[in-house]
Amino acid sequence: MATQSHRSKGAQGPYDGGTAGIQSAACTASVPPAAIASICVGPGTWAEHLDYHGKGVSVQGALGPDGTVLEFGAGDGSLAFQLLDALGDQVERYAIVEVSAHLREMQAKRLQGFSPKVQWLDALPEAIEAVVVGNEVLDAMPVKLLHRMNQTWHERGVIWAPDIGQYAWQDRPTDARPPVAIEGDHDYLCESPVQASAFMRTLAERLRRGAAFFIDYGFPAHEFYHPQRHMGTLMCHHLHRSDADPLTDIGAKDITAHVDFTGIA
């Protein structure tokens, strides 16, 4: 199932059963090999989140001598603006990996005051010596849906149902399993973040020096795969409204799923 990026979340879905705070996963690699950490931060600007003292990780502290920041999927450029404004001359180069021409145009307009430092890339570089940042990137990557039904695991897919004239779910048996065992034998739906996991593996392989910070909505694995979270975390957002049905208004909704920070780390 493909998802689209969404950058204005606010409402909690019915799956939360509490709070799903904004978290950042930090992969620090001052010198290889990289060490992995997860940190939880409170309200404030993204620049403040990424300068989270007491955990030994900050954009300022991780910047190399060439002062390079690499942002993956910069949205409207808000995070880039805040970092460039907060860090000033410490940033010599701010590279943005962005494939959308429309978003590039928005970013260029917002960041025109920093134009000598900013450049755009079409793909992740083969070798990275930089501070890598991402705001609500991982939760917008495609996921697989795994459905335990009658004690048998299935992968959920989408078919066209001509009898009802619309798309519908179809479950097929699979050997795939969630990364942790789900207690109980009740029906259970969850996401498998295959693309986000592959992205992080690629990033870890290419990050020669620096750090990676990701701000997102998510949980550690024991909360993400809690037996009571039996409907998963997949949500749709459109016109400031949220629902859990990606098969309606197809193409008009942003589709997201919370992040398993344990798996990402």
Model feature map: region roles:
Residues M1-F72, D76-A127, L146:
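Rossmann-like AdoMet
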Residues L124-A265:
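Class I S-adenosyl-L-methionine
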